[in-house]
A protein has these predicted regions:
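Alpha-helical transmembrane segments of integral membrane proteins
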Residues: 166-383
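Gly/Trp-centered helix-boundary motif
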Residues: 1-196, 200, 330, 344-364, ...
């Protein structure tokens, strides 16, 4: 290279076409959709790190000069002078032993999703700490053996905070909401992703080849779609042992149909276009024509439906949990909290908390879906 010649501009690792760049700009200019995506990603990232936010084990501990990581490793209690069992770091014996010979760093919330609150200030379900009276807090401190509990000026500040109270089983609601948000979001994203792949594949095969194959698959899909989905879901959920992947498989049996008609219509429209005929004339295989030439255009319609499929998947899981046919008993679930709220109308913090988180998550996904749909609409522009 000659002296003084400017170095060639480094190309980015990905290149957006002018049309996709316009779509991305339209999405960014849609403030409601863009901010909804940011908020959802932040909440989802926090839920993925739930063990570091809400846990009944310390993040880091030092005992007799040894650095321990209880959040990753299950240490036996005999390591701290106790019995041969899993260490309970909330046990006063274990906690005092570690504090006497080291230190502990706890997460912001010292409850996991299955941690049972010992010596609650009131009969379960316990209201949030900020709703308790000083007399209730003093009584709770006396149960825990805290000195000077009867004369403490601000006794509620000395209790472990229950920001949103507990449920009827003595579990911290904030911890249950964080872990329940993660399960719901992962369930919706996985179900939407897998069902979209199957639906796009089936629609592409139908639309591209057409003829008797399209006719036969269309009749099968019509029969399959006419089955009573809700009754089949209830029957299968009652017969099979409930689990995350069992529910995922059951719902996948019906959710893949939602994208077939959209993708099929796009392939039926595009299979006779000039660029497809030119690709056939050049000797390209059907698989290459479908994947490289027709599928990118058909995916535009599929992508606009994706956020709404995630929304529908989360709503279905929440409904099944509310009916008692979803996740196994004891699993953190937004639907199970809603059911507890219905059964405990005198404890409104349970139902209101679960409803607020569920409504927020579904609203964010709807706003994201509307923004994606408008971004792909060539007739809409945003200033």
């Amino acid at each position: 290279m000659r002296a003084g010649a400017s170095a060639p501009a480094r190309r980015p690792w990905f290149n957006l076409s002018p049309m996709n760049r316009r779509r991305l700009d339209n999405f960014r200019r849609n403030r409601r959709g863009a901010w909804s995506l940011r908020i959802f990603l932040v909440l989802f990232a926090c839920s993925l790190c739930a063990e570091f936010i809400a846990n009944d084990r310390p993040l880091i501990a030092s005992y007799q000069g040894e650095l321990l990581f209880p959040v990753f490793v299950d240490y036996p209690e005999d390591k701290f002078g106790g019995f041969q069992a899993r260490a309970d770091y909330r046990d006063p014996f274990v906690a005092n032993e570690i504090k006497a010979h080291g230190w502990m760093v706890w997460p912001p919330i010292r409850f996991a999703n299955s941690t049972t609150i010992l010596d609650p200030p009131t009969p379960l379900p316990t209201p949030p700490t900020w709703m308790l009276s000083d007399a209730q807090c003093r009584a709770a401190l006396q149960k825990q053996g805290v000195k000077d509990a009867a004369t403490a000026a601000s006794p509620c500040w000395k209790l472990e905070p229950l920001w949103l109270g507990s449920d009827q089983d003595g579990h911290d609601i904030v911890a249950r909401l964080i872990y329940g948000f993660r399960i719901s979001a992962l369930f919706g994203l996985i179900l939407a992703g897998v069902s979209s792949v199957i639906g796009v594949f089936a629609g592409a095969v139908q639309g591209y080849f057409g003829g008797w194959l399209d006719l036969m698959m269309q009749r099968v899909i019509e029969i399959w779609s006419s089955l009573p989905h809700l009754y089949i879901l209830i029957i299968l959920s009652a017969i099979l042992a409930p689990s995350f992947f069992v529910l995922l498989t059951i719902l996948l049996l019906f959710s893949w149909v939602s994208l077939v008609h959209v993708v099929r219509a796009e392939f039926l429209r595009a299979r006779n276009f000039e660029y497809v005929n030119a690709a056939r004339a050049l000797g390209l295989s059907n698989a290459k024509i479908i994947v490289k030439h027709v599928l990118p255009n058909a995916m535009v319609a599929a992508l606009t439906f994706l956020p709404f499929i995630v929304n529908s998947s989360i709503s279905t899981l929440t409904s099944l949990d509310f009916l008692g046919l979803g996740m196994p008993p004891g699993s953190p679930s937004l639907g199970e909290l809603l059911l507890q709220g219905k059964s405990n109308l005198s404890a409104p913090w349970i139902g209101l908390s679960a409803f607020a988180v569920t409504a927020l998550m579904l609203s964010l996904l709807i706003f994201i879906g509307e923004a994606v749909r408008d971004a792909f609409d060539p007739r809409k522009t945003f200033s």
